[in-house]
């Protein structure tokens, strides 16, 4: 959870480091670079998490700042088809391809998580039956993790697979 500006910097640097050395931001914007757009979304996600966690309802400026950031975040959510909820994903999230959409409804996702396009982390039935993902996990293209499933650390979920039972770490 991002509670201080130091945490915010660490999360953003961890996310950016997963994408390697980037070109100038203006070139990424002009040519519509996929990694640039994804990093832009991740930065907005992290700032919105920070504003939400430090929200003081007595201070109207902080409330306004959070509302504006949340508006921009939801706009990018719809535009890029990346449904990543607040305060769920750890530092170092990497989304190599966002073309098919990414849908996350998880309890917790560990650090250095890789999720490709068309992946679904979803509930089965009620809202309590949602997956929990460990550290250094990779979800390949089209994979699904459905229900109250614990995926252990250092796991790889194969392309187009459906996970409905726990996966041990290793």
List where the protein language model places each region:
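Left-handed beta-helix
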Residues: 80, 85-86, 90-97, 102-106, ...
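Terminal amphipathic alpha-helical/low-complexity segments used for targeting or macromolecular assembly
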Residues: 1-80
């Amino acid at each position: 959870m991002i509670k201080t500006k130091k945490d915010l910097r660490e999360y953003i640097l961890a996310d950016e480091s997963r994408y390697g050395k980037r070109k100038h931001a203006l070139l990424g914007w002009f040519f519509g670079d996929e990694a640039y757009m994804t990093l832009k979304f991740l930065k907005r996600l992290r700032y919105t998490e920070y504003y939400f966690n430090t929200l003081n309802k007595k201070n109207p400026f902080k409330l306004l700042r959070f509302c504006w950031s949340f508006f921009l975040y939801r706009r990018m959510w719809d535009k890029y088809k990346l449904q990543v909820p607040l305060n769920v994903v750890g530092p170092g999230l990497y989304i190599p391809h966002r073309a098919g959409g990414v849908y996350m409804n998880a309890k917790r996702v560990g650090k250095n998580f890789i999720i490709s396009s068309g992946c679904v982390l979803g509930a089965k039935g009620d809202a309590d039956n949602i997956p929990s993902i460990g550290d250094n996990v990779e979800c390949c293209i089209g994979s699904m993790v459905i229900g109250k499933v614990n995926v252990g650390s250092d796991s790889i979920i194969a392309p187009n697979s459906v996970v409905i039972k726990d996966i041990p770490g290793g």
